[in-house]
């Protein structure tokens, strides 16, 4: 049983709902049901439970935050919607995501305790219900207060949390005490769990109070050292409750919807019809009974024709989807997501295409970029970061709409091919797996697949929860299974390796003691200057020297808290003292590459925009690569600007600092741009700063070895820029002497090319232009002479009369000349069948004769190929005489 003092002291009664069997608390002796959907209908639509006047979600948010500030909480800024500090999910789905796993595990203290926040969150778990149910959103703000109770520090728990909720709803919002129900439940998410109260008012869940004290491990609950108050008050839900509008969209997006309706010519729906439809939709699950059936049931309950109801409701659903999804997508892009076919970009594209699909169904053809821009104008006051990204958002949305239209053009052929493949496998139509494959591989929405299939005489059933299932498949990051170099059990008892490469990255040699030799090739030292592979930087190489021998170090890896050296040659005995010598030339080159990577990505961000995030990197010799998120291939001018800025930073010889900072302090000071290189799983963060404190050029969390100043890089040269995936661009670059060697090699090739065409390097471009002009003139003349020759050959063809057709077989191994001859010959003789034989290739041209029966007969003689009605080509390994006989047989 879950209870609280405020409930016991305020005359609440504990009851059990006869329908769902849940226990709940209410002050009303006559309340029978739990107060939640679907056990009770909405009771607030057209009838808000309070007269408290709140004119906007922004005003409600501020009242919530101030209420908790008055009650001893520290207000903190919202986190991004992209969870860059986590390696398990892409998007923030609740305010507690901000603190998982580092704070909730006890590894890192919270930024304040207790704290209050209003966190934009994204959940696609009910994406198919958005627009239909009247209450579901993909993007929402979770207002929340959190308290973190440690064994030695109690903040507050169930009693105080419930008291705060009770006072906020009754005193701050003026909702009568008898209207509030506390329903007991269990919550689980993000690897944690705990009992909870769901706060309900007139059938609507407006808050959840979670008392988190479990970690979920292998499906079992394990007690956490912390007891965490994790609350979630739905900003949009509460505002809807206060307004009593037919749907949540009409409350939250009222101004935007009014403008869109006016632009696209869709009238505002009858409020009573939409309100009643929303009430009934709230009590059923269309995914279970089917959307069409749901419409029929609701129409019957309201007393209207189902067809009329669809005509009224369906256009509104499309506009609701537009309103919700456009805000969610704008949040995502403003926080650095580029629509693509992978990761968070996949989810952004899914939402954009769902908007386009819904607008298409109801016949709205207004440019999506214009509809988005209207919404951005509405959002700019509450979310200035969205307005700051306006140009990027509109450019990406416009690009995505163009891609979608291309998809629609290619859909018929792709669906036809998929149906043919299904029939070959003995299936009459396409199943859900086929729909997923067509969407993931070619971006074709299932509704379009169904349309095309129907035109081809096949029925395709589109699941009502199709997009929800798609989103679930792509919501989590894929973790690559780790296989440690040696078993943890073999090093678990050893002390942590002292990491000399961090104390002095310029250390070339060092002394150490051998703690353990494992499996005849792995050596663990008490301290090392050998850098273990990590963060895209390869491991150091070198030697270990000891009395009586020497071992070559060929690899270095971290295994838990120790550094393991992979060696070849003689093995040092355990307990021996060794001298480690780093391959300094290689290490120093890698340091230049690593510091150069930081300089380069910041240069790319400053030229292409703040949406640039690292998607991967590998430092190597003589070249390194840096993958970044970007929606198109940079122009030559942009690449030149990036290279110029990077080398300007090198020339300025900016200092490079390493700071060890507490995680919270670093995040508060620098933001989540720290995690360009990925998640850092430590309580303290090693922060690399390029440039002085008053004006740093770049700041990132990084565990690599770096230079003392940018001048040591010497030179940064971009060698190649290519698009390696949808939304990902790769920069291949080099630094220092390797860059000089690359430039010298280019100059050598340029000089060689200039010599070949007869000119100097300085005159190379002009020489190439003249050479191309001569080549074009020669090609033009060759074509002219070929046409003249072809006309002569065509006029003198020796053709044999076979039936009513004339047949000529010509041995010629020149496709281009054959085309010219065929064009000239078939233009003057429509009954001509002209066959060219060149090696084992056969090509047939006609002036209008159907070659289909000819090809069929030739196949019997060994011909393998096909073509159109008047043209065929393929392979034939027989003799010409057999070919002629087959032609006679076919044309006689």
Curated annotation (Swiss-Prot):
The UniProt record lists the keyword ATP-binding: yes
Cofactor note: Binds 1 zinc ion per subunit.
One of the GO BP terms on file: alanyl-tRNA aminoacylation
Keyword set, alphabetical order: Aminoacyl-tRNA synthetase, ATP-binding, Cytoplasm, Ligase, Metal-binding, Nucleotide-binding, Protein biosynthesis, RNA-binding, tRNA-binding, Zinc
Catalytic activity as recorded in UniProt: tRNA(Ala) + L-alanine + ATP = L-alanyl-tRNA(Ala) + AMP + diphosphate
InterPro entries for the chain: aa-tRNA-synth_II/BPL/LPL (IPR045864), Ala-tRNA-lgiase_IIc (IPR002318), Ala-tRNA-ligase_IIc_anticod-bd (IPR018162), Ala-tRNA-synth_IIc_core (IPR018165), Ala-tRNA-synth_IIc_N (IPR018164), Ala-tRNA_lgiase_arc (IPR022429), Ala-tRNA_ligase (IPR050058), Thr/Ala-tRNA-synth_IIc_edit (IPR018163)
Pfam family name, one: tRNA-synt_2c
Binding-site positions, Zn(2+): 594, 598, 702, 706
Name of the molecule in the record: Alanine--tRNA ligase
Organism per entry: Pyrobaculum islandicum (strain DSM 4184 / JCM 9189 / GEO3)
């Amino acid at each position: 049983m879950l209870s609280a003092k405020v409930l016991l002291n305020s005359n609440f009664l504990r009851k059990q709902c006869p329908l769902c069997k849940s226990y709940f608390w209410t002050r009303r002796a006559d309340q029978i049901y739990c107060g939640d959907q679907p056990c009770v209908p909405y009771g607030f639509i057209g009838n808000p439970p309070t007269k408290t006047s709140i004119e906007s979600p922004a005003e409600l948010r501020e009242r919530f935050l101030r209420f908790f500030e008055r009650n001893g909480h520290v207000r903190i800024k919202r986190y991004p919607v992209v969870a860059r500090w986590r390696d398990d999910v892409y998007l923030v789905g609740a305010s507690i995501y901000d603190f998982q796993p580092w704070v909730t595990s006890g590894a890192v203290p919270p930024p304040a305790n207790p704290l209050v926040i209003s966190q934009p969150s994204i959940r696609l778990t009910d994406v198919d219900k958005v627009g239909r149910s009247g209450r579901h959103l993909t993007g929402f703000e979770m207002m929340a207060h959190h308290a973190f109770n440690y064994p030695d520090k109690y903040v507050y728990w169930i009693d105080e949390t419930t008291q705060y909720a009770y006072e906020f709803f009754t005193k701050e919002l003026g909702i009568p005490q008898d209207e509030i129900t506390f329903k007991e439940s269990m919550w689980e998410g993000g690897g944690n769990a705990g009992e909870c109260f769901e706060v309900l008012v007139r059938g609507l869940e407006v808050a959840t109070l979670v008392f988190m004290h479990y970690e979920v491990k292998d499906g079992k609950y394990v007690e956490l050292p912390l007891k965490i108050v994790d609350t979630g008050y739905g900003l949009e839900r509460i505002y809807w409750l206060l307004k009593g509008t037919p749907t949540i969209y009409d409350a939250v997006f009222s101004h935007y919807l009014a403008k869109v309706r006016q632009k696209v010519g869709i009238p505002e729906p009858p409020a009573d019809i939409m309100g009643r439809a929303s009430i009934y939709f709230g009590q059923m699950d269309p995914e279970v009974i089917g959307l069409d059936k749901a419409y029929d049931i609701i129409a019957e309950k309201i007393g209207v024709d189902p067809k009329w109801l669809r005509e009224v409701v369906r256009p509104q659903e499309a506009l609701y989807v537009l309103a919700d999804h456009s805000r969610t997508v704008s949040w995502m892009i403003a926080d650095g997501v580029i629509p693509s076919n992978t990761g968070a970009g996949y989810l952004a594209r899914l939402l954009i295409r769902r908007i386009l699909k819904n607008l298409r169904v109801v016949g709205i053809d207004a440019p999506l970029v214009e509809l988005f821009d209207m919404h951005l104008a509405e959002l700019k006051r509450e979310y200035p970061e969205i307005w700051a990204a306006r140009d990027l958002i509109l450019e990406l949305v416009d690009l995505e709409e163009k891609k979608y239209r291309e998809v629609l053009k290619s859909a018929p052929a792709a669906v036809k091919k998929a149906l043919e493949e299904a029939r070959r496998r003995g299936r009459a139509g396409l199943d859900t797996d086929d729909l997923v494959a067509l969407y993931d591989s070619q971006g074709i929405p299932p509704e379009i697949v169904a349309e095309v299939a129907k035109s081809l005489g096949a029925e395709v059933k589109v699941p009502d929860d199709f997009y929800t299932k798609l989103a679930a498949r792509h919501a989590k990051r894929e973790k690559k299974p780790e296989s440690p170099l040696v078993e943890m059990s073999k090093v678990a008892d050893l002390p942590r390796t002292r990491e000399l490469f961090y104390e002095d990255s310029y250390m070339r040699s060092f002394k150490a003691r051998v703690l353990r030799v494992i499996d005849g090739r792995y050596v663990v030292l008490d301290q090392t200057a050998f850098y273990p592979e990590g963060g895209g930087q390869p491991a150091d190489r070198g030697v270990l020297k000891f009395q009586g021998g020497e071992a070559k170090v060929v690899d270095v890896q971290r295994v838990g808290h120790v550094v393991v050296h992979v060696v070849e040659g003689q093995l040092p005995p355990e307990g021996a003292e060794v001298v480690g010598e780093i391959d300094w030339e290689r290490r120093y080159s890698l340091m230049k590459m690593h510091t150069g990577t930081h300089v380069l990505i910041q240069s790319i961000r400053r030229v292409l925009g703040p949406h640039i995030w690292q998607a991967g990197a590998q430092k190597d010799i003589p070249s390194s690569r840096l993958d970044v998120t970007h929606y198109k291939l940079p122009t030559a001018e942009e690449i030149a600007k990036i290279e110029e800025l990077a080398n300007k930073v090198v020339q300025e010889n900016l200092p490079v600092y390493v700071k060890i900072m507490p995680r919270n302090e670093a995040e508060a000071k620098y933001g989540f741009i720290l995690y360009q290189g990925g998640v850092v799983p430590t309580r303290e963060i090693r922060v690399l700063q390029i440039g002085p404190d008053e004006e740093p050029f770049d700041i990132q969390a990084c565990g690599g070895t770096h230079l003392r100043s940018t001048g040591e890089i010497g030179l940064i040269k971009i060698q190649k820029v290519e698009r390696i995936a949808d939304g990902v661009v790769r920069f291949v670059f080099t630094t220092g002497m390797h860059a000089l060697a690359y430039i010298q090699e280019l100059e050598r090739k340029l000089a060689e090319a200039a010599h070949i065409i007869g000119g100097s390097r300085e005159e190379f471009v002009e020489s190439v232009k003249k050479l191309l002009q001569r080549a074009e003139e020669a090609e033009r003349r060759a074509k002219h002479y070929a046409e003249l020759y072809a006309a002569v050959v065509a006029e003198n063809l020796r053709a044999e009369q076979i039936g009513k057709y004339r047949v000529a077989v010509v041995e010629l191994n020149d496709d281009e000349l054959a085309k010219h001859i065929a064009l000239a010959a078939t233009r003057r003789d429509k009954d001509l069948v002209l066959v060219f034989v060149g090696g084992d290739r056969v090509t047939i041209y006609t002036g209008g004769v159907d070659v289909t029966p000819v090809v069929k007969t030739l196949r019997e003689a060994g011909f393998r190929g096909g073509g159109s009605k008047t043209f065929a080509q393929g392979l034939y390994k027989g003799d010409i005489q057999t070919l002629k006989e087959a032609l006679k047989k076919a044309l006689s």
